[in-house]
Every structure is written in C-alpha cells, then in structure tokens.
C-alpha cells in the first residue's frame, strides 16, 4: 500500500433554495486545497422535500483532482418522476455536488445530506 488513506466520518448538512426546473444548485462543497487534501471518493445519502413531494437516494462520487465522476443509485420518490438529478463537478479546487430540478419542479426545495469521505 502506498501512503495513507483517510476515511472521514459522517458530515451532516441541510438547507433549502428556490428551485427552478433546469437550474443547477450547488448543495455541498468540499475544498481540495492541495494534493494532500484531494478527495478520492465520497458517498452521499440525500433527501429532498418539496411540499408533500420527496426523494431519497445515494450518490457515489470519485475525483482525480481535475475531474469529478458521479453515479446516482437507490433513487426513491413519491411522485411520477424524481424531483432532482445529481452531478458532481470540480471548480476552483472545490468538489461540488449539484442538484438540478427536473421539468415542472419549482418552488422551495429542502435538502438533507449525509456524507462519508475518503481522502
């Protein structure tokens, strides 16, 4: 094994924004100051509420410091279609998790996040 792997505990966050279909919103940011802080993998558990509508899911994110890759899975929702789609990006040394409301989704969107990080 080369070097060390750091597995960070659960980080819990919540918030809300005014959703507009197709408009991306950053819901979590992890700073990668240098190679020692490079985020390798993040596992997210997410929950979204919009009125009586809700969605829960997992997202697995990996990063090489330049690009971010994400895979949504375990997606559950109580509406005809999911409320949001999730993707990860890297900008200004930050790993961002973004939620994009799907067609027809507008208004106040609440979110709850739990994450585990491997650096």
PLM regions and their residue ranges:
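Low-complexity, small-hydrophobic/phenylalanine-enriched stretches
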Residues: 1-12, 44
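Residue-level recognition of well-ordered beta-strand positions that form the cores
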Residues: 6, 45-47, 60, 98-100, ...
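Surface-exposed ligand/attachment interfaces on beta-rich extracellular proteins
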Residues: 12-41, 49-53, 67, 102-106
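Exposed beta-strand and adjacent loop surfaces of beta-rich binding modules
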Residues: 41-43, 56, 83, 108
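Beta-strand elements of well-folded, non-transmembrane domains
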Residues: 48-50, 63-65, 117
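Short, surface-exposed beta-strand/strand-loop-strand elements in extracellular ectodomains
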Residues: 54-63
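Terminal beta-strand-rich extracellular "head" domains
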Residues: 62-81
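Low-complexity intrinsically disordered segments
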Residues: 76-119
